[in-house]
């Protein structure tokens, strides 16, 4: 990709990854502008000192920007972060689900709200230090014969002439891969995103930082949720919600026997052992949470095993639309729009990357075309740390899909993301649903 005179907004967290990303982009010829989001309200600033968007992080990012010779700005996103990430985090626990705030922050803030700042600064792209590969593919110019064989084969079988899209892949460094956290990004976001670290490993990144004498070269990676001190989410929820908003209730085992009482359904997650009443010969685990009755259901390890579940708010990527299409795409069924539709069918601003359909405006596939065929086999990750397992994915109505696991898995947790892969290519993903029939109803 020719980077001449193209301007990039780089999200800088003050860590080694985004710092080296800035250096790599600069070396590739991009005009780089560093931006750090301030996401902490002023009254919470003391607990943000060592966080990725806290005061020290801002100072570190500013120092790196100065060393690289790029401008640096701080943008206040505290109100939006509170509304879109923290409130979501708390409300999911109140609903008996276990949230994934990193996915939400990427979609809504880093690659969402930040785009308005990027446009104001005259930027063409947003870049981050994520470990993932985003390939920008232009499949020809409207002439079927113009689609290079190499592009068609490298992009999960896409041979649709004249369609511009982005393919999300796992990082070369599988231990650090973060493609899972980017699954919910829409094409309008992926097509304007750059992830320069995707083809590098963490040791290589640190070595580059040391060679540049960056002070953050050996900075320790954050291993916890950035807004939860000490990774103690229960204390955070008590502070954020207040004890009176906790939903107290009763604990039952899977046979319907009363076990005890609890101080709030928000304090539990599927697979949890800590904090449960004793008195059982075998270890007890949380196997279900019922927000309607505020009941916590416990069982033994075998009760955590699941062979099928559903996901909703599914976001399919072009790799799935094409590699698993039910039939060849029909030119007569295309829909011209000036924006890219989100899952709620509301349109956002046009992508900065025009699609090469010879002046006929931007295009997107119809809803029917954007679904893969009814069922196919893929690899599914049910949490970030999960290695992935073979599954049969069946598309359902209303942006839902059913995941069948030939090899049943432990602790499939409602509220977490299930991300679907074909080898290293992200096909899509969605949010794990709670079983429609509660455990005690069986």
Ranges and model annotations:
Residues 1-183, 194, 204, 286:
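ATP-dependent adenylation/nucleotidyltransferase module used to activate substrates
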Residues 127-134, 138, 148-154, 163-330, ...:
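AMP-forming adenylation/ATP pyrophosphatase catalytic core
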């Amino acid at each position: 990709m020719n980077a001449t005179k193209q301007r990039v907004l780089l999200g800088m967290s003050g860590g080694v990854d985004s710092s080296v990303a800035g250096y790599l982009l600069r070396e590739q010829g991009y005009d780089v502008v560093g931006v750090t989001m301030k996401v902490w309200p002023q009254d919470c600033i003391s607990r943000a000192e060592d966080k990725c968007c806290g005061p020290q992080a801002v100072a570190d990012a500013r120092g790196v920007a100065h060393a690289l010779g790029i401008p640096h700005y701080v943008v206040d996103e505290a109100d939006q972060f509170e509304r879109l990430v923290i409130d979501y985090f708390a409300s999911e626990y109140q609903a008996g689900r276990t949230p994934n705030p990193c996915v939400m922050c990427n979609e809504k803030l880093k690659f969402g709200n930040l785009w308005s700042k990027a446009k104001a600064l005259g930027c063409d792209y947003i870049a981050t230090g994520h470990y993932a590969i985003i390939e920008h593919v232009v499949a020809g110019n409207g002439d079927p014969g113009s689609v290079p064989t190499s592009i068609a084969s490298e992009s999960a079988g896409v041979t649709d002439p004249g369609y511009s899209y982005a393919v999300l892949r796992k990082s070369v460094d599988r231990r650090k891969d973060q493609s899972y956290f980017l699954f919910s990004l829409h094409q309008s976001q992926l097509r304007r995103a750059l992830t320069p670290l995707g083809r590098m490993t963490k040791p290589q990144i640190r070595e580059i930082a040391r060679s540049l004498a960056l002070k953050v070269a050996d900075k320790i990676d954050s291993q916890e949720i950035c807004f939860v001190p000490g990774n103690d989410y229960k204390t955070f929820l008590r502070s954020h919600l207040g004890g009176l908003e906790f939903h107290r209730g009763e604990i039952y085992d899977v046979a319907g026997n009363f076990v005890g009482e609890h101080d709030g359904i928000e304090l539990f997650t599927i697979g949890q052992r800590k904090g449960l009443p004793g008195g059982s010969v075998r270890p007890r685990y949380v196997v279900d949470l019922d927000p309607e009755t505020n009941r916590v259901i416990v069982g033994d390890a075998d009760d955590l095993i699941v062979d099928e579940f559903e996901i909703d708010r599914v976001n399919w990527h072009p790799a799935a639309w094409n590699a698993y299409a039910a039939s060849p795409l029909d030119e007569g069924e295309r829909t011209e729009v000036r924006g890219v539709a989100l899952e709620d069918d509301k349109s956002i601003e046009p992508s900065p990357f025009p699609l090469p359909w010879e002046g006929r405006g931007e295009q997107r596939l119809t809803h029917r075309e954007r679904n893969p065929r009814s069922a196919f086999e893929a690899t599914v990750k049910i949490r970030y740390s999960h290695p992935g397992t073979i599954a049969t994915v069946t598309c359902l109505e209303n942006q839902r899909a059913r995941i069948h696991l030939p090899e049943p898995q432990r602790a499939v947790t409602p509220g977490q993301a299930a991300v679907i892969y074909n080898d290293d290519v992200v096909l899509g993903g969605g949010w794990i649903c709670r079983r429609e029939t509660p455990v005690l109803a069986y």
